[in-house]
Amino acid sequence: MQFIDQAEIEVQGGKGGDGMVSFRREKYVPAGGPSGGNGGRGGSVIFEADANLQTLLDFRYARIFKAEDGKKGGSSNCTGANGKDVVVQVPCGTMVYDLDGECLLGDLVSPGQRLCVAAGGKGGLGNQHFLSNRNRAPEYALPGLEGEQRQLRLELKLLAEVGIIGLPNAGKSTLIAALSAARPKIADYPFTTLVPNLGVVRKPTGDGTVFADIPGLIEGAAAGIGLGHEFLRHIERTRLLLHVLDVTAGDPIANFRVIQQELDAYGRGITEKPQIIALNKIDALDGEMIGEIETELKRFSTAPCLHISAATRRGLDDLMQLVWQWLDEMAAADAEAQRLLELELQAQAAMNNPFNSDVPIDGVTYSS
């Protein structure tokens, strides 16, 4: 399947139904008065995050989404039927921008999360609403309002906890294939990987963690050279970076610094992410040469270095043990931060509550 991570589309909510002009006509009621109903609401265009989608490819073929118009109001004060909403499935991790205002409308990250991107117009009022002492038989009603219309830009940022980065042909695809059931294209030439590959790696407990194999970065990637500029955004959501460094390719230290400089140039907090360096293809060098490379790396980075061979699976158990340890520590820190935030919010609510003088929260009493 072709990987598409950007798209521009048009969305339009349905027009509200027109109000009705009618009068009550019944036997023995010669002047029944106005009885025109309101028009129905126009349908809305709604985005819904779908965990089964991984690309915006569908938007290459369908670029305009319009919801159904509301129905006209009826007689006997009957309101017209509402127009049907159009629900559009998008991948989790889709960011929705309004092209006119260049503002972010929403970020759909959780399966089932919804975002209304074009609201339907309100239905027009029927003539029943215009009855007054001066006008006992109004012969006019309001038309329905037009629905919202927007030009949108969709941008997909993959949801992965671990991002695998490195120069082309460093062995990133071989690594994700060795760790997961993913089967990316693997060959002995640069830029074999042209799109991000996702793989679910299982912990010893059976829980799955998503790894993203990012296409090879080169010098100038942050400025748009090569493939890196297109895919650096997918690193933004990762929690941990796994830098695969080919110890047999030219100058490994210079190669490492190239990637670090590109991450720093791209910005957006990427260089602040925890990083593990995986020295790959160690079976091609002797231990002394690998030790020299590791010693030199420590001059430029405090990240831990692990020795692996993705092709033979050598050292992968130790690598994954460190990855799981770091991810578990991050999850514990996040849980503790969330707990403290909830306590703070509870304390503020208790102090602002005039009916509670002393409210115990998690064993602590806060006096208002």
UniProtKB/Swiss-Prot annotation:
Its cofactor is Mg(2+). Keywords: Cytoplasm, GTP-binding, Hydrolase, Magnesium, Metal-binding, Nucleotide-binding. GO terms for biological process: ribosome biogenesis. Residues 1-159 form the Obg domain. Its EC number is 3.6.5.-. Pfam families: GTP1_OBG, MMR_HSR1. Mg(2+) binds at S173, T193. GO terms for cellular component: cytoplasm. GTP binds at residues 166-173, 191-195, 213-216, 280-283, 309-311. GO terms for molecular function: GTP binding; GTPase activity; magnesium ion binding. An essential GTPase which binds GTP, GDP and possibly (p)ppGpp with moderate affinity, with high nucleotide exchange rates and a fairly low GTP hydrolysis rate. Plays a role in control of the cell cycle, stress response, ribosome biogenesis and in those bacteria that undergo differentiation, in morphogenesis control. PANTHER family: DEVELOPMENTALLY REGULATED GTP-BINDING PROTEIN-RELATED, MITOCHONDRIAL RIBOSOME-ASSOCIATED GTPASE 2. Monomer. This is GTPase Obg. It comes from Synechocystis sp. (strain ATCC 27184 / PCC 6803 / Kazusa). The lineage of its organism: Bacteria, Bacillati, Cyanobacteriota, Cyanophyceae, Synechococcales.
